[in-house]
Amino acid sequence: MSAKVLVVDDSGTMRKIIIRSLNALGVTDIVEAGDGSDGLELFKQHPFDAVLTDWNMPRMTGLELLKAIRAAGSTVPVILITTEAEKGRVLEAVQAGVSDYLVKPFETEGLRKKLQKFIGVAVA
């Protein structure tokens, strides 16, 4: 069984890095978006097992995306992959309902552990 994951980041390079890491873990059902607004539209159209999102993006930030997902009543795991590691910012995300976060640059092993924890599927 492969998880379906939504990857949201305004950097095409970072999306490729995240997707490559997911592929290395055996996750191949991946949908990508270049900002939170597009990510939210995709989220509304498709069921996802997890959402991986950057924080700082144009049009709609990852935090705004997270809040919109939670406001819709969804409990899908949302993992922020971000450079935002300052305590106040992390607390803001936790209060908004983030499942977890990874600080860029991240290791594939860290991503694997979080995916196993939240979506309960074995990843390589």
Indicate where each model-derived feature is located.
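Two-component/phosphorelay signaling modules centered on CheY-like receiver
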Residues: 12-31, 118
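Acidic catalytic/metal-coordinating carboxylates
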Residues: 35-38, 61-67
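Receiver (REC) domain active-site loop signature in two-component systems and cognate sites
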Residues: 57
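Acidic, metal-coordinating helix/loop segments flanking the phosphotransfer/catalytic sites
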Residues: 32-50, 71
